[in-house]
Amino acid sequence: MKKIDRQEVYDFLTRIPKGKVVTYGMIGEYLGNVHFARMVGNILHENTDGEKYPCYKVVSASGKLSENYAFGGIEKQKELLEKDGIKVACNKVDLKKYKW
């Protein structure tokens, strides 16, 4: 299986506009295969600079927030998304409205 370039994942995060989210699969697809979603998740969990590489903007394919968000858990991810103007209900975002 192709190896994913960690920096390419992090660079992708910096291009997500304020008020928008992406899914793990969208990043995987950008890297060449939607099935890379799990590897993308592992890379994001190892992110050491949440301000420089805003992984809070990544949600599941159903719009669900990450219970294991690396920088403070699901409540912190929710707070950051709401600060960007993204409405969160029941720990999910409306992908029809907010997907980049």
Regions found by a protein language model. Name each.
Residues 1-100:
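Nucleic acid-binding interface residues in structured DNA/RNA-binding domains
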